[in-house]
Regions:
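FKBP-type peptidyl-prolyl cis-trans isomerases
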Residues: 5-226
């Protein structure tokens, strides 16, 4: 007897954008989440947090490797609990990512560093781990490097509209700014100022973002306004 089976599973594919809710934990402690109710349970300051699902463009390194692999095997509406080893999260801690700088280099710029502080140096975020004898040691490893992580995730929906896909790319890659749409053209408006100094986007960054928008939407032109 021949049986006819029908499967309605629709797993994710690279190049698709999805909205995802998640709770990330390390050793049982929450380090990031998008679910307000859980944040309130943990006693976190919900006033300063954003509780919207994040946009993830699959195949473009929007999230860590282990999380993306799990999402690829899920479908819209599905929830899952995932354990991710350090190798597929933020990698192992690397001693080569620790550097020592002369303390006077910071003093000359009017910066007083203290252990535990985070600084941006040469476009990299680092944490001051020690200070003494005229030297400052900075750790450029990701704070979660070397850590096994646990995630609860839910794929909320698939993002289909071109404008929303472009907005998702902007949010992930830049974190601020806005988009203006005019027919087949997208303009990325970037006016980010910090302490009176304008921070321009590098040509490499612009080209990468331009390629992602053109590849994953039907827009034909991407411009930048700074």
């Amino acid at each position: 007897m021949l049986l006819t089976l029908t499967f309605n599973f629709q797993f994710m594919e690279k190049g698709e954008m999805i909205k995802v809710d998640y709770i990330g934990k390390e050793n049982g402690e929450v380090f990031d989440l998008t679910v307000k109710e859980k944040a309130q349970e943990e006693g976190l300051d919900t006033e300063s947090m954003n509780f919207e699902p994040i946009n993830i463009l699959l195949g473009e390194n929007f999230v860590i490797e282990g999380l993306e692999e799990a999402l690829m095997d899920m479908e819209v509406g599905e929830e899952a609990e995932i354990e991710i080893p350090a190798e597929k999260a933020y990698g192992k801690r690397d001693s080569e990512n620790m550097e020592t700088f002369p303390e006077k280099a910071f003093e000359e710029q009017g910066v007083q560093v203290r252990p535990g502080e985070q600084l941006m140096i040469g476009g990299q975020r680092g944490r001051v781990i020690s200070k003494g004898s005229g030297r400052v040691k900075i750790d450029f490893n990701h704070p979660l490097a070397g850590k096994d992580l646990e995630y609860w995730v839910k794929i909320v929906e698939k993002v289909e509209e071109d404008e929303e896909i472009a907005e998702g790319i902007l949010s992930n890659r830049l974190g601020h700014g806005e988009l203006e749409f005019d027919g087949d053209k997208v303009t990325v408006v970037h006016r980010h100022e910090n302490e009176g100094h304008s921070h321009s986007l590098s040509d490499e960054f612009k080209e990468r973002m331009r390629e992602e928008i053109l590849e994953h939407t039907s827009f034909e032109e991407v411009e930048f306004e700074e």
